[in-house]
Amino acid sequence: MKRIFDHPAICYHDFITHPQVSDNAMSQDTAIEKHYGRPGLLKRMLRTLANKGISENDLTFETLAPVDEFHVGGLDATRRILNRLTLFPQDRLVDLGCGTGGPARAIAAISGCHVSGFDLTREFIETGTTLNHMTGMADRVSLAQASILDVPAADATFSHAVMLHVGMNVADKEGIMREAFRLLRPGGRFCVYDVMQTGDGALTFPLPWASDPSFSAVVRPDAYLAAGLAAGFMLEAQHDESAGMARMLTSMSDSGSANRPDNGSDPFHNLARHIEEAVVAPTEIYLRKPGKA
C-alpha cells in the first residue's frame, strides 16, 4: 500500500515552500496562501509520478497518494479516518482545508459519497480540480477556494466533516468549530486530525506547516475540545496516533534530504523528534452534532 512516507524524497520538500511569513501587516489568509502556494504544482506532481513509472493514464487516488496526501500517515491515515466515520454513498462530506483533494478523492472513491473541499490556496484548488477530471472523480468531488472560517455553503448542508492537518495554521479554533457545526446536519460527525501539543517542550522550527512560530497555531487537544463543546458539539472519541510516526518521519527526512546538515533546519527531523519526545502527537478528535441524522 502506498503512503506519503513510502516515497519520502518526493514529499513536502518538492511541492511546498517555506517562506518567512511573520510580517504583522500580512493577514493570516494571505500568509497561508503565500506559504503553500507555488506555481506549476501540477506539472511537478505529474513529473514526479512519471519518474516513478506512473503515467497520466494511470492516475487514481492510490497512485496519486505519494504526492497529494499531505498529512502524517498519508493514505493509511485517510483510510483509518474513513473507517471510523462509517460513510455511505448517500452522505455528503466537507473537507475543510482540502489541499489538492487527495483525501477527498480517496474518501469519495472508497465510500461512494460526494465530497466538497475548501482551501485558501488557489494553486491547490486549481490543481485538485484538474486531478478530479484526470481521475474521473469530478462528479463526486468538487473543490473551491474559500476560508474554512467562512465556507460558501448553507447551514446543515453536510452529513460529516473532516479537517486534516489544517488547524496547526489557524489560531481561531473557536471559529473552526462554529463553522463546522453550522455546516453539519444534526447527528453529523466532525473528525479533526492535527498535530497537537502533548508535552511542555518548546517547538523547534521550521516544521512542515510553519517556518517560524508566527505561523504556527499548535495547541493541546483540550483547546480543540473546549472550542468544540462551546460550539455545541459532543465528544465522541479521541485517538493519539503517534505510534511509529517518528520513525517514518525520520526515514522520510533522511531519504529526501541526504545532503542537508543535521542542524535543526529540516522540518521533518524536527517533527519526528518532537513526536518521539512526546512534545506533540498526531491526534484525531471525533465530535458529533446533537440530534438524529
Give residue spans per PLM region.
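A short acidic, Gly/Pro-enriched loop at the edge of an enzyme's catalytic core
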Residues: 149-161
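Conserved alpha-helix/loop element of class I SAM-dependent methyltransferases that forms part
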Residues: 54, 71-91
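N-terminal auxiliary segments of SAM/dcSAM-dependent transferases
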Residues: 11, 15-50
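A short SAM/SAH-binding and catalytic strip from SAM-dependent methyltransferases
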Residues: 160-172
